[in-house]
Swiss-Prot record:
CDD domains: IPMI
Co-factor binding details: Binds 1 [4Fe-4S] cluster per subunit.
Keywords: 4Fe-4S, Amino-acid biosynthesis, Branched-chain amino acid biosynthesis, Iron, Iron-sulfur, Leucine biosynthesis, Lyase, Metal-binding
Coiled coil (residue ranges): none
E.C. number: 4.2.1.33
Keyword Transmembrane: no
Subunit note: Heterodimer of LeuC and LeuD.
Pathway entry: Amino-acid biosynthesis; L-leucine biosynthesis; L-leucine from 3-methyl-2-oxobutanoate: step 2/4
Superkingdom, taxonomy of origin: Bacteria
The protein's name in its UniProt record: 3-isopropylmalate dehydratase large subunit
MF (Gene Ontology): 3-isopropylmalate dehydratase activity; 4 iron, 4 sulfur cluster binding; metal ion binding
Amino acid sequence: MSGKSIFDKLWDRHVITGDEGQPQLMYVDQHYIHEVTSPQAFQGLRDAGRKVRRPDLTFGTFDHNVPTVNIFDIRDAISKAQIDKLAENVIEFGIDNASHGSDKQGIVHMVGPETGRTQPGKFIVCGDSHTATHGAFGTIAFGIGTSEVEHVFATQTLWQVKPKKMLVEFTGNPQKGIYSKDYILALIAKYGVACGVGYVVEYRGEAIDRLTMEERMTICNMSIEFGSKMGIMNPDQTTYDYMRGRECVPEDFDAAVADWKTLVSDDDAEYDKVIRMDVSELAPMVTWGTNPSMGVDFDTPFPEVRDMNDERAYHYMGLRPGQKAEDINLGYIFIGSCTNARLSDLQLAARIVKGKKISPNLTAIVVPGSRPVKRAAEKIGLDKIFKDAGFEWREPGCSMCLGMNPDKVPDGVHCASTSNRNFEDRQGFGAKTHLCSPAMAAAAAISGHFVDVRRMPEVQ
């Protein structure tokens, strides 16, 4: 009998009933909510006369609609209604939350790990497609729809069919200037946005082992762009060191670690599909089109038109085959989002822009992903570095990742963005998004166009 993967072990721990290959009832350890996908679910509870079964296992954040200049100046009626309704709902149903304007407020996928609620071995859901971020800690974590949010509210359970298992092994040593964002963008560019459909993706290998938790979260965050709603990594000493001392970790932390160590995938675990990628061969990645698979490394020209999707993408983006990333005339820079708005991301960008000025006629904003990150960054002077360079230093929130708040890229303008999606109109009507690492975005802010960060002395 072959060994088990970490996913197998976690799945088995959480099955309540049901046969393999059929929908199985799973117990949910942690339910994260935010203002966009929860209002109808709460109303469904009211209509049925139900309560939240485990408010102690539920945690709310305010992030998608929050303005980042004056956080309380919410002018869009729908956004204000969603913010106000969540504030009412968490009080009515007794749910702890990082309230709007509080010292813990931030993007849900940052607040969970920061507070220690995200822990190895947990089964985590949230009404948000980037919930796979939490898989970096050795959890089953994925996004759910609003009707499922209501089901979890009422029962603390969810019906799920166990997916197939894919192993993605990152090997080798990266060149300087290559980061975990490049790993995941390169994977998606090579294998496509549908490769992970129907699979849980386990990321491992020597290149993963060397990453910090913040870098690991970047990879798991974009599992959904690879087609998989779940990404997972094995917990290790890096995981435990990150978690130790955080607010919500188990009181007997050493005992918890002893249990978490048993979750690691067995050496003889079997997978339905295996992909290996040598990161030593990677160059900085930039997307040129309108889905995350439409990306190239800095050294490679944009591809020839292969199908109608390429043709439409080139038309929308105002680009053509044979051009290169350095040819893109950028107008906006966005450093933020649940993909790359952690302290280490901001430190990396600050090293590159320190003592320099952003290119004329370019707008550049930095949005810390949470208030704790903002405070930590300001404590070491990152805010001053960015502001001296000409960046706008904002309050925490989802910001320009998506057009659901005042932060939008103008129609027709190209934006270098550290976020996770480059769909048409994602950052605002007519916005042209180019996904990249924080280093690439910061360097582009200074030059006005993409440059090869491998050649910069500030890059390690």
